[in-house]
Amino acid sequence: MKKVKTVGKSKKEFITGVVHIRATFNNTFVNVTDVHGNTLCQTSVGACGFSGSRKSTPYAAGKAAEAAAKNAIERFGMKVVSVIIRGPGFGTEAAVKALQSCGLTVTSIADKTAIPHNGCRLRKKRRV
């Protein structure tokens, strides 16, 4: 009986995409999607090998964005991205600079950090 050879999946190319950067006080998540919002690749500072207090640094956020950008360029041939930033973290500017240094063209940067209009009650104040 003959073995049936299967042909590998056809490589999809996404020239344009969206990079979502979620910067919290403890970590930074970088998610690369197509223009419809389907996730293509993602990474975080913790997944790049940083731990503890080093995860919240701008350098670590830049490294995570660099890893996500290289992944998107190699696997999908991405060239042009628009950036959406969410969260109050420190690494957002470093992440955008890292995307540009990897060869991606950044067309727009949107800050969509959620701002409460006096919504939920805050936690009690810490007494040290």
Curated annotation (Swiss-Prot):
Say yes or no: keyword RNA-binding present.
yes
Q: Short name of one Pfam family for this protein? A: Ribosomal_S11
On whether Glycoprotein is a keyword of this UniProt record, the answer is: no
> Which biological process, per GO, is one annotated for this protein?
translation
Protein keywords:
Ribonucleoprotein, Ribosomal protein, RNA-binding, rRNA-binding
Per the record, its GO cellular-component terms are: ribonucleoprotein complex; ribosome
Gene Ontology terms, MF aspect: rRNA binding; structural constituent of ribosome
Which InterPro entries does this entry report, sorted A to Z? Ribosomal_uS11, Ribosomal_uS11_bac-type, Ribosomal_uS11_sf
Q: Which residues form a coiled coil?
A: none
Q: What does this protein do?
A: Located on the platform of the 30S subunit, it bridges several disparate RNA helices of the 16S rRNA. Forms part of the Shine-Dalgarno cleft in the 70S ribosome.
> Of which family is this protein a member?
Belongs to the universal ribosomal protein uS11 family.
Q: How does it assemble?
A: Part of the 30S ribosomal subunit. Interacts with proteins S7 and S18. Binds to IF-3.
User: What is this protein identified as?
Assistant: Small ribosomal subunit protein uS11
Q: Which organism does this record belong to? A: Wolbachia sp. subsp. Drosophila simulans (strain wRi)
The lineage is:
Bacteria, Pseudomonadati, Pseudomonadota, Alphaproteobacteria, Rickettsiales
